[in-house]
């Protein structure tokens, strides 16, 4: 009995120390991704992403992007958490799309296609969205999600690592410069890929970078770079982590042209 009590106490202490170090947001993400999801996979079969797609196919209306978004939001808020941009931050994204009306958008990180559907439904006629996804299983689900929403003609999925695909955009994908970039992939790639976009001449004066999850999990090096560089004019939009009451935010960084930067690598 004493040993059990001591063990429980040590586990509680370890949890509290982890919570203090990481914060509620990262601990919650870890719980959902590494504890809850494997259990659900075992009990329900398939993957979480496949279950999200199946829910959309069963509950959304084909050819209706808004109903697709609502079905994903309902599933992820009531059944299984997933790292989509979500409706709270999604409304901020909508406002940015409506303000700038981009004709060519690059998305880094497609996941299940939520943000691709969200952006593509608001793009003006003739506009296109290129979305990069390193995981071929996620890319396949994104394609099915776009097909179901009726947006397949507006979006092209590029499968591979962003650092490999970005240098190919001009020659292989007929890109001159980008009007908007949505960053929502690996957080440690935000800064390197921003630098790569600059180096490849893919940004023009007025190109909008919109970065998700800059607070949780967090992108401190990216924020330090864009906020400290005269090449960018930044605006922070405080919001909540998708499907949680945990503070997160989006960072908008509008490219002003080459300037002084605190980071050179």
UniProtKB/Swiss-Prot annotation:
Function recorded in the entry: Catalyzes the O-methylation, and thereby the inactivation, of catecholamine neurotransmitters and catechol hormones. Also shortens the biological half-lives of certain neuroactive drugs, like L-DOPA, alpha-methyl DOPA and isoproterenol.
Residues bearing PTM Phosphoserine: 260-261, 265
Known cofactor(s): Mg(2+)
InterPro entries assigned to the protein according to its UniProt record, in alphabetical order: Catechol_O-MeTrfase_euk (IPR017128), SAM-dependent_MTases_sf (IPR029063), SAM_O-MeTrfase (IPR002935)
EC number: 2.1.1.6
Cross-referenced PROSITE patterns: SAM_OMT_I (PS51682)
Binding site residues for S-adenosyl-L-methionine: 85, 107, 115, 133-134, 160-163, 184
Residues annotated as binding substrate: 187, 213, 242
Transmembrane segments: 3-19
UniProt keyword list: Catecholamine metabolism, Cell membrane, Cytoplasm, Lipid metabolism, Magnesium, Membrane, Metal-binding, Methyltransferase, Neurotransmitter degradation, Phosphoprotein, S-adenosyl-L-methionine, Signal-anchor, Transferase, Transmembrane, Transmembrane helix
Source organism superkingdom: Eukaryota
Name of the protein in its database record: Catechol O-methyltransferase
Any GO MF annotation of the entry: magnesium ion binding
GO biological process assignments: artery development; behavioral fear response; catechol-containing compound metabolic process; catecholamine metabolic process; cellular response to cocaine; cellular response to phosphate starvation; cerebellar cortex morphogenesis; cholesterol efflux
Family assignment from sequence similarity: Belongs to the class I-like SAM-binding methyltransferase superfamily. Cation-dependent O-methyltransferase family.
Residues exposed to the Extracellular side: 20-265
One Pfam family per UniProt: Methyltransf_3
Any one cellular-component term (Gene Ontology): synapse
